[in-house]
Design a protein with these regions (language model features):
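Glycine-rich phosphate/ribose-binding loops and adjacent secondary-structure elements
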Residues: 204-375
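Ordered alpha/beta subdomains of enzyme catalytic regions
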Residues: 1-222, 331-489
Length: 489
């Protein structure tokens, strides 16, 4: 039964998606056009910003959208009827997708990606889109936070062995690179995505030879650029002295790039190792630290004066250790009506943050021309032009008394056309371009938004028309519920 050769991603799905698809098809509403927004509600890691990522893999999926023969055989085996399966056999994606680009700064309650497609298609891609964007955005955000703390220090992604399976390791390495890391230990990620690779050797290498001096010398015989792992036996009494000894003996035959500390009191050991290296004349040799690092650990080590030049970050990056789920959702906001236009849809909840914003919308970043900084993100209905309102009024969507007026601004549409009527129309940037785009984007928000602790909340506001439309729909649904309640009495 376990065969991947004919495996598509169409069944990488929640069962209820296929159940709903069958019901839509049976009721002959499956071709109705529908609009869904993908977004998250709360900022991950208590961060002041997040970083959108995952579009490359979304495109990979959509380009191969379609049920395989083995998919259909399996669906038949669990009870789906031949007439429905016959329809699925020829199903292709014919919808449109607008999305932020990879490396875009993003914030809670704004559409990262918008799908406009026949209802059955839009429903069948929900689970995998969420699966992709939730993970990629989470890890890229974590990586960017670590980059902010590390400043100009080198950052190496070491998470493959601790990742939640093979795909998470591969795509997590890519996410980390876009988020600001300099390299990865994952050789496959280097091959597929052009990410620089880096690595040293393991404790097992030293243990194999039973002696650090011998092990380091054997390593140097085949590797000119040497980074020696010095904590297998005793960092200061054995590891560092033997690394220095080998480097002195081999001289110009090797490039003594650095030593790596993977255990113990990194702050103390790095300071002592730095002193020993400097006294031996190796002032340019770098000290690399690893061992359960993240932005908090690096902040602490820097505060203690640790003499670390490069950081190898693994487990706590690749798993999103302190918040392993982004919590993005995919919500219906409009559906085709009998007249062929759209009727807005809203979901209500006793939790205010779970009330959706109905209608087809655009998201703009409002840049103050005087400061060059972002004043906030501005969500409008699709037919609105933010330049029509001068000055532009930004107000908090809940605490509406919080407002400001912007006279001189640029409104940047954050969504790009990715698919139009089933055709890919977007040229995917390279990983290096996405990485640089993020670096530039971070310059557009205030330092207060990037603070590690208690960052200033970045405004995400609705236009007056969008706000009015939302509250109109809330009132309509409330009236409908009231009528139903009266009918049931």
């Amino acid at each position: 039964m376990y065969q991947l050769e004919d495996d598509s991603l169409m069944l990488h799905n929640d069962l209820y998606q296929i159940n709903m698809a069958e019901s839509y098809w049976n009721d002959n509403i499956h071709e109705k056009m529908a609009v869904f927004d993908l977004y998250f509600r709360k900022m991950p890691f208590n961060s002041g910003y997040a970083v959108f990522n995952g579009l490359k893999r979304v495109i990979d999926f959509i380009e191969h959208f379609g049920f395989s023969e083995s998919d259909l055989e399996y669906l038949k085996s669990i009870g789906y009827k031949d007439d429905f399966l016959s329809y699925l056999k020829d199903l292709k994606f014919t919808g449109s997708i607008r999305s932020m680009q990879e490396g875009e700064l993003c914030f809670g309650n704004e559409p990262l990606l918008r799908v406009e497609a026949p209802l059955i298609q839009a429903q069948l891609i929900e689970t995998i889109l969420l699966n992709i964007v939730n993970f990629h955005t989470l890890i890229t955000t974590k990586a960017s936070r670590i980059r902010q703390i590390a400043s100009n220090d080198k950052l190496m992604e070491f998470g493959t062995r601790r990742a939640q399976e093979i795909d998470a390791a591969l795509w997590g390495a890519r996410a980390a690179y876009i988020g600001g890391f300099d390299s990865t230990s994952n050789v496959r990620a280097g091959k597929l995505f052009g990410i620089p690779v880096s690595g040293t050797h393991a404790h097992a290498f030293v243990q194999t030879y039973g002696d650090e001096y011998v092990a380091f010398k054997k390593y140097a015989e085949r590797h000119k650029n040497c980074v020696f792992l010095v904590d297998t036996f005793h960092t200061l009494k054995s590891g560092v002295p033997n690394a220095i000894k080998v480097a002195k003996e081999l001289g110009d035959k090797i490039n003594f790039v650095g030593i790596r500390l993977d255990s113990g009191d990194i702050a103390y050991l790095s300071k002592e190792a730095r002193r020993m290296l400097d006294e031996a004349g190796f002032t340019e040799t770098k000290i690399i630290a690893s061992n359960d690092l993240d932005e908090e650990a690096i902040t602490s080590l820097k505060a203690q004066g640790a003499k670390v030049d490069s950081w190898g970050v693994g487990t706590k990056l690749i798993t999103g250790y302190d918040q392993p789920a982004l919590g993005a959702v995919y919500k219906l906001v409009a559906i085709e009506n009998e007249e062929g236009s759209y009727s807005d849809r809203i979901k209500l909840s006793n939790n205010a943050e779970k009330v959706t914003t109905p209608g087809k919308k655009n998201v703009y970043r409002i840049i103050n021309k005087k400061t060059g900084k972002a004043e906030g993100d501005y969500i409008t209905l699709e037919n609105e032009n933010p330049y029509d309102e001068q000055p532009l009024k930004l107000f908090h969507p809940v605490h509406t008394y919080k407002m400001k007026f912007i006279k001189s601004f640029e409104a940047i549409d954050l969504h790009h056309n990715i698919y139009e009527n089933g055709k890919l129309v977007y040229q995917m940037p390279t990983e290096d371009e996405s990485r640089e785009y993020l670096a530039q984007g971070l310059q557009s928000i205030w330092d207060e938004n990037k603070r590690f602790l208690n960052p200033q909340e970045y405004p995400v506001d609705l236009s007056k028309a969008c706000w009015d439309n939302k509250h109109k729909r809330i009132f309509e649904v409330a009236e409908h519920v009231k009528e139903m309640e009266e009918d049931n009495e």
